[in-house]
Design a protein with these regions (language model features):
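N-terminal signal peptide c-region/cleavage motif recognized by signal peptidases
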Residues: 15-17
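Sec-dependent signal peptide recognition
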Residues: 3-11
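Short, surface-exposed alpha-helix to beta-strand junction/turn motifs within ectodomains of secreted
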Residues: 41-65
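Surface-exposed, short loops/turns at beta-strand junctions within beta-sandwich domains
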Residues: 83-88
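Extracytoplasmic/periplasmic copper-protein system
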Residues: 22-25, 103-118
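Short coil/turn motif common to extracellular beta-sandwich-like domains
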Residues: 34-42
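A short tyrosine-centered beta-strand micro-motif
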Residues: 90-92
């Protein structure tokens, strides 16, 4: 009986850990990619999250205008980029709240290639 209770508890703990961790699975542009200037930044997570902030900055740290962060809970978010992006390095920093109310943060960079490179 005790062994069965331990198995159930372990199963529950593993399930909760899986639910608790909703990492960023993919992004568009992809991390470290060299791309044409994107029209949007798309983030897809391993589970549903509430996205609380996303910033896009250039190599000087200047913020670029994105859509407002939606208030919905979802796996995928797409935020339009409203400023033209010149060739150079960019960084996306995001923050979300997972289903277990833990805060998840991350960042990735990408490069906008010059039009001659494409």
């Amino acid at each position: 009986m005790m062994r069965r209770l331990v198995q159930i508890a372990l199963g529950f703990a593993v399930a909760m850990a899986a639910y608790a961790h909703t990492p960023l699975q993919t992004s568009v542009p992809a991390a470290d990619a060299s791309v044409s200037a994107p029209k949007a930044v798309e983030l897809t997570f391993g589970g549903e999250v509430r996205l609380t902030s996303v910033t896009l900055t250039d190599s000087t740290g200047a913020a670029k205008h994105l859509d407002s962060v939606p208030t919905t809970i979802a796996r995928t978010f797409s935020l339009a980029v409203h400023d033209p992006l010149s060739p150079g390095a960019y960084k996306v920093v995001w923050r979300a709240v997972g289903g277990d109310t833990h805060i998840i943060t991350g960042e990735f960079g990408f490069t906008v290639a010059s039009s001659e490179a494409h």
